[in-house]
């Protein structure tokens, strides 16, 4: 087959003016080059690709390399940053090592921390005897993960926990590298924690790695894998026979424990909108103060005495109360409702309480400790001192020593 002759195209509408050649016909005018059938261009590109492929095949035959053995990116000597593990792999195989050794993806179920995400989900309930409930409350009493829960959330946690007796010694409860499904609270006995530097449990007598700690009764473990959707970071085995654990499944843990933190912060942030320091000040400490508060439900403590220690400032979150200027006063001088606050005077002046606060309904307040109050709200002390109690008709001098 004879191919037509080629010459450079002198046409401003074609960008590849020196490299692109099309068949020449004496009968075509320069304008016709722009509307020449596209099949000639496709044929030219096809011939070019064929030539390059043939030359590459010939070059590969002349410089034949040994086959590259596949190396797992999850092995003991894998490099997560894509670098070569030794000098022999540096070269043509470096790109392959980089691609295979890239960091693996992290995925989990969607969990939007808001009040309307519960949908049709209900926490599981496992029946327990009164004796089991008593032991369980004692086991979680000092655990920091349960300290911020209200009564309703605590009841859900108590109902969802499952008792797991560990009858013998050296029983593996969790293994390093496995997927996390449960969070455990130790009621009785002790458990040893081992960490292998390779990241997973290895075979052999030394496969668990080095012992890094011991968890006694009242402690807990397994929360990191559930919070961060990561493999188990350690191996935990029973250190003595007759141990008892309480297990909480992953979904309940994330729904209750993690969302409760978000809801508590949202509640205190909403209540803080009425604070003078947070409403008028742009200071970063005042804006971050709601994250330091703790929600407290105190149905039994109905009175905050004027003689108590000045350690806490309370904010009304969901209740109604009345302020009494005297110890035996019968007439209230000020009423508090949702969003109001009290207790700042004693903290600003380091003085005794000037009044007694009596709750008329169930109390749910957000409290800020004295040290956090002085550290976070100290820069806005001037705004706090401008707060007046103008609606109080009696006992103003005794109640508000800041007024002059």
From Swiss-Prot:
Keyword presence, NAD: no
Question: Which residues are 3',5'-cyclic AMP 1-binding?
Answer: 145-276
Q: Which GO terms describe its molecular function?
A: cAMP binding; cAMP-dependent protein kinase inhibitor activity; protein kinase A catalytic subunit binding
> Record's superkingdom?
Eukaryota
Alphabetically list the UniProt keywords: cAMP, cAMP-binding, Nucleotide-binding, Phosphoprotein, Repeat
Does this entry carry the keyword Iron-sulfur? no
**UniProt GO cellular component terms:** cAMP-dependent protein kinase complex; cytosol; nucleus
Give binding positions for 3',5'-cyclic AMP 2. Answer: 277-398
Mark the residues carrying the PTM Phosphoserine.
105
| InterPro entries from the UniProt entry | cAMP-dep_PK_reg_su-like, cAMP_dep_PK_reg_su, cNMP-bd_CS, cNMP-bd_dom, cNMP-bd_dom_sf, RmlC-like_jellyroll
**Region annotation (Dimerization and phosphorylation) ranges:** 14-144
Q: How does it assemble?
A: Tetramer, composed of 2 regulatory (R) and 2 catalytic (C) subunits. In the presence of cAMP it dissociates into 2 active monomeric C subunits and an R dimer.
What family is this? Belongs to the cAMP-dependent kinase regulatory chain family.
Q: What does this protein do?
A: cAMP-dependent protein kinase PKA regulatory subunit.
Q: What is this protein called?
A: cAMP-dependent protein kinase regulatory subunit
